[in-house]
Amino acid sequence: MELILSTSPAKLTLDPARQPELTLRFNLSKLTLDPARQPELSLSPRLAELTLDPTCHPEMSLSPGPAELTLDPQHQAKELPVPKLPELILEPVHCRPELMSACADLINDQWPRSRASRLHSLGQSSDAFPLCLMLLSPQPTPGAAPVVVGHARLSRVLDQPHSLLVETVVVARPLRGRGFGRRLMEGLEAFARARGFRRLHLTTHDQLYFYAHLGYQLGEPVQGLAFTNRRLSTTVLRAFSKPPCPQPPCKEPILAAQAVPRSSKGPPLPPPPPLPQSLTASPPPSPEPLPQSPLETCYRDLKGCPIFWMEKDI
């Protein structure tokens, strides 16, 4: 089978006189994309076999002409541009409904969940709380929509009118470790402070030091008011948050002599010998409990995993 390269660099054509079937394999020769010029194709010296490099997977489609193979430009790999921190803005999701779908994808990338359920949850955002905030970068090109690079949810706190509970804090994976999480938290603190709130609460499993660097300290559990008709009492909330009650210590065996029933026949048995001094002495007092390590917590989430409650006055 003969292969001919056409003048267009993005097309691979077959000799019109010979149009046998074109098969794609994944283990012999390789068809790779030039990283400098993506539409250009490079072929290995072997002509009869055409394969894709597993490191780059642009989708390929056959055009109606049976002898033409083209790249679909709509499926080219897209990289998330790195925005500048001063250009980022915070906006409530209910003020930008056209970005709700992109926000749902961002959250589901971290915590997979039904898309319909996620969109429904985001649709509950309102100025009356709970309120979902998006961290947005400016339009990458004129006329394009902003890019959602972060999200956080704010809810009122039961019995604490000047507090908010921060939940579902997430930053796009390619942008983590570059200051976008700090920018998101500082922005929502300013957002809450401007509306009269004075304290923020949150929970974390593995970001204790990140929040500690932002000024958060270990705190007590609180309940966010997501739906007013499903409020839990403070007693029930603390019952779920407190660690299980410690088991009572095992009782020491009674070493004193017990009365032995007398036999109806024969003389009574002699009394037992006295116990050794080492067994009758009282045990030494237990040492004072050690202070709790910063990496330990007595609270558990609904799955039983350790969780840290933190708070900060703003």
Curated annotation (Swiss-Prot):
Coiled coil: none annotated. This is N-alpha-acetyltransferase 80. Its EC number is 2.3.1.-. Belongs to the acetyltransferase family. It comes from Mus musculus. GO terms for cellular component: cytosol. It is found in: Cytoplasm, Cytosol. Residues 90-243 form the N-acetyltransferase domain. Pfam families: Acetyltransf_1. One of its GO terms (biological process) is regulation of actin polymerization or depolymerization. Its main location: cytoplasm. GO terms for molecular function: acetyl-CoA binding; protein-N-terminal amino-acid acetyltransferase activity. The keyword Lipid metabolism does not apply. It catalyses: N-terminal L-aspartyl-L-aspartyl-L-aspartyl-[protein] + acetyl-CoA = N-terminal N-acetyl-L-aspartyl-L-aspartyl-L-aspartyl-[protein] + CoA + H(+); N-terminal L-glutamyl-L-glutamyl-L-glutamyl-[protein] + acetyl-CoA = N-terminal N-acetyl-L-glutamyl-L-glutamyl-L-glutamyl-[protein] + CoA + H(+). Substrate binds at R113, R118, L119, H120, S121. Residues 267-292 have a biased composition (Pro residues). Acetyl-CoA binds at V169, V170, V171, G177, R178, G179, F180, G181, R182, Q207. Keywords: Acyltransferase, Cytoplasm, Transferase, Tumor suppressor. InterPro entries: Acyl_CoA_acyltransferase, GNAT_dom, NAA80. The keyword Lyase does not apply. It is an enzyme of class 2 (transferase). Gene3D superfamilies: 3.40.630.30. N-alpha-acetyltransferase that specifically mediates the acetylation of the acidic amino terminus of processed forms of beta- and gamma-actin (ACTB and ACTG, respectively). N-terminal acetylation of processed beta- and gamma-actin regulates actin filament depolymerization and elongation. In vivo, preferentially displays N-terminal acetyltransferase activity towards acid N-terminal sequences starting with Asp-Asp-Asp and Glu-Glu-Glu. In vitro, shows high activity towards Met-Asp-Glu-Leu and Met-Asp-Asp-Asp. May act as a tumor suppressor.
